[in-house]
A protein has these predicted regions:
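Conserved cytochrome P450 K-helix/beta-meander segment immediately N-terminal to the heme-binding cysteine loop
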Residues: 343-344, 362-390
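Short, small-residue alpha-helix embedded
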Residues: 273-286, 422
Length: 467
């Protein structure tokens, strides 16, 4: 009764059952279909919906600066049960509180700057070349290939090298090592951990009650510490992430334990999201062959050799940019909300007062597929980013795949360079055919913060072109 009629959120729209009880929301989190259910609620109830007794979901474009940016004076802290830490007590860039985050980010900004990216281009391109080589072998064999798996191999190898000065060897072996496989299993386990933590179960108790989770967590932490520790002992001029941290480190900088903890976070955040995006881009292009032909024409007429495809040159391609933006819209790599807590003073979010202590977040999947924001939201239509007057009323400012504010994605420069270049070189090298088994690849994917994806089976045909 209190939750329905006396709670500070009682006036907000949403189903009565959700206003009274937590279990509908937590059940969806456990199942992995939370973004689909929330999308239905937003279509029914509007831009602000009460999805649980103490939780609001909001999809207004102007909410980004209020929830995640600096649209108000009072800070919006991260929801603690969502951003639980592993066994390490050291801060990492995602789970750190605001003061630790500012200190850590100050150093990592050097590692992810445009200048650093230029020095890392050769390293990154070497892995893209290996990706193309391995896919070319598959094309010659004439069998269909799981493109999603190879994109994962490439992005993990790139991020591993840039983090530890060591590749994971996934592209060479054409399989992930056990540590990366453990990372994927921890994503789903994280949903259960967050639910139990929300009900007041301490994180360490959760691991105590579920030993298999504790073993996976400890294996992840141990492997990260070993890799990062080996890198910290190296004397090298190679321009990886840690080289910049060490160069600019001081008494206000990062401890070695914090470097190790943050390295593990960067591996997952910098690899899985890019691979997910690229898989989505390939899928939607193959489902919409007219757009694939337009992209092929742009890339294959702009460049005369593959060596001309560089970070700088691909950044100027208008068709490629439109396709990337539409892919972000229809298939965001991070579809679910990353919740914050409203401050003690309460806060105005997109013109609406939110009381103190309320969980609030913006689910990208719901915001980007809203019929209030986009014409034909379920249609893959890159022309909405090419000036088509039909889509002039689209609220494109709601699309923020890297978030906003002081805690936005620090690796977005790298991500942009990586996805542009990999996609351009794939289209330069191969004609592709989506296999029937993957005809509805996006349907029914579950989400545990990131997407849980099936194989993306594609037949590749190598073009006979100059390298």
């Amino acid at each position: 009764i209190h939750n329905l009629w006396l709670h500070p959120l009682a006036k907000f729209p949403g189903p009565k059952l959700r206003g009274a009880f937590y279990f509908p929301a937590y059940y969806e989190i456990a199942k992995g279909d939370v973004v689909y259910k929330q999308h239905e609620l937003h279509e029914r109830f509007g831009d602000i919906v009460r999805i649980a007794p103490n939780t609001l979901s909001i999809i207004k474009p102007e909410a980004w600066k209020d929830v995640y940016g600096q649209g108000h004076k009072a800070p919006m802290p991260k929801c603690p049960e969502f951003y639980w830490r592993g066994a390490s007590v050291a801060a990492d860039i995602i789970a750190a509180d605001d003061s630790d985050h500012t200190r850590i980010r100050r150093l990592l900004n050097y590692a992810f700057s445009e200048q650093a990216l230029k020095s890392q281009e050769q390293i990154i391109n070497s892995y893209i070349t290996l990706l193309i080589s391995q896919l070319s072998k598959q094309a010659s064999a004439g069998s269909a290939v799981d493109v999603m798996a190879y994109l994962n191999f490439a992005t993990f190898d790139i991020t591993g090298d840039l983090s530890f000065d060591e590749s994971f060897g996934a592209l060479e072996a054409e399989t992930h090592n056990q540590w990366v496989a453990t990372l994927f299993s921890m994503l789903r386990a994280g949903a259960i951990i967050r639910i139990l933590a929300a009900y007041g179960v301490p994180t360490e108790k959760i691991f105590e009650y579920i030993p298999v989770l504790a073993r996976a967590r400890d294996a992840h932490d141990d492997y990260t510490k070993e890799k990062a520790g080996r890198r910290l002992e190296k004397k090298t001029d190679r321009k990886d992430f840690i080289s910049y941290v060490l160069k600019y480190n001081d008494e206000r900088g990062m401890t070695h334990d914090e470097i190790k903890a943050t390295s593990g976070t960067l591996i997952l955040a910098g690899s899985e999201t890019s691979a997910t995006f690229l898989s989505g881009a390939v899928y939607y292009l193959l489902k919409n062959p007219d757009w694939m032909r337009k992209l092929q024409e742009e890339i294959r007429t702009t460049f005369t050799t593959e060596s001309e495809i560089t970070f700088a040159s691909v950044s100027k391609l208008k068709m490629l940019h439109a396709i990337i933006m539409e892919t972000f819209r229809i298939y965001p790599p991070v579809p679910a909300a990353l919740p914050r807590i409203s401050p003690k003073s309460g806060v105005i979010v997109a013109g609406t007062y939110v009381p103190a202590g309320i969980k609030i977040g913006i689910p990208q999947y719901c915001a980007y597929r809203s019929s209030r924001h986009f014409l034909n939201p379920e249609k893959y239509a890159p022309e909405r980013f090419l000036g088509d007057p039909k889509y002039v009323e689209d609220k494109r400012s709601v699309i923020q795949p890297f978030s906003v504010g002081p805690r936005n994605c620090i690796g977005q420069n790298l991500a942009w360079a990586e996805i542009r270049t990999i996609l351009a070189r794939l289209v330069w090298n191969f004609d592709m055919q989506l296999q029937d088994v993957s005809r509805n690849w996006e349907k029914g994917q579950t989400s545990f913060v990131l997407w849980s994806k099936p194989s993306l089976m594609v037949k590749l045909h190598k073009r006979n072109v100059v390298a």
